[in-house]
Amino acid sequence: MSIQNEMPGYNEMNRFLNQQGAGLTPAEMHGLISGMICGGNNDSSWQPLLHDLTNEGLAFGHELAQALRKMHAATSDALEDDGFLFQLYLPEGDDVSVFDRADALAGWVNHFLLGLGVTQPKLDKVTGETGEAIDDLRNIAQLGYDESEDQEELEMSLEEIIEYVRVAALLCHDTFTRQQPTAPEVRKPTLH
């Protein structure tokens, strides 16, 4: 079962966002929500934060709010399931060009970094493998292409980049949401 089956369809979500005048694509909204979850926001504060970032602090209408709750729940569930079900929410289908998908990916990554940044304000201080992945995501967010490029080659490259971004998001989730075990000698003594 894929995450796409648990959330509203991409076109349906796009319609809800357009009706509300949200100014974000479904990919960007999913990137933002994914970034907040991967950054460690796992309580109900995600909704007011999302409203602040995307709708001048105002709540969304019922249809969009319900669709976003489904998106948040499905994304959270997919990430908690060791990430096996987590997929980027990008447009698909015969009518979607590789260039549209590349643009959607860049938007997803930009908004993922925004969501991650608001939940992890010291993101620039992260080191190691996660720090490198975040730096790579910053570069991917500036993804560009030449429309004269071979579309088949670009599609193959894009699929590799999408998989890399997916794994980088899982790494961020693991880094910022998993409790680090404390060695017994480091734990504070319990007073009786």
Swiss-Prot record:
Family in the record: Belongs to the UPF0149 family.
Pfam families referenced in this protein's UniProt entry, alphabetically: UPF0149 (PF03695)
The name this protein goes by in its record: UPF0149 protein YgfB
UniProt xrefs under InterPro entries: YgfB-like, YgfB-like_sf
GO cellular component, one term: cytosol
SUPFAM superfamilies, sorted: YgfB-like
Gene3D superfamilies noted in UniProt: YgfB uncharacterised protein family UPF0149, PF03695
